[in-house]
Design a protein with these regions (language model features):
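Short S/T/G/P-rich N-terminal loop/turn motif that feeds into the first structured element of a domain
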Residues: 1-77, 83-93, 108-127
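Amphipathic protein-protein interaction modules
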Residues: 88, 96-102
């Protein structure tokens, strides 16, 4: 399935001190397992995830110039894209059923989230 306008996505960005990255890595392990166990990559049974990607990079003093040095933080981005609101809603329901993982997400979001785009429409895509 292709990502197209009208789909619905999530993108959450975190800025984590380098000495705390193991907490994020542990969460990402459990989140990836959750995604693999409960989501589909094809078919009609929601949630069908069109994109699940996690990005990680040191935070640079100047992001356009890596030679500027690092800030001592690591940046993470989690991106998920679904066909429409039904898939996004199914994802949220399933995620909240995993109370421990969901509580960890809330804790990490409260501490380290710097940007969150939640359940937003895809407004541009390569068709």
């Amino acid at each position: 399935m292709k990502i197209k306008t009208g789909g619905v996505g999530f993108h959450v960005a975190f800025k984590v001190p380098n000495n705390k990255t193991q907490i994020m890595e542990s969460f990402l392990d459990s989140h990836e397992n959750f995604m693999r166990e409960t989501h589909h990559i094809e078919g009609t049974v929601e949630p069908v995830v069109l994109c699940y990607a996690v990005l990680k990079s040191p935070e640079f003093n100047n992001p356009l110039d890596p030679s500027s040095g690092e800030t001592g933080h690591t940046l993470y981005g989690i991106t998920e894209i679904y066909n429409g609101p039904e898939g996004a809603q199914a994802h949220m329901v399933l995620g909240q059923e995993r109370a421990e993982m969901f509580a960890e997400l809330v804790k990490l979001t409260n501490e380290y989230c710097v940007s969150g785009i939640l359940g937003a429409p895809i407004i541009r895509a390569m068709h």
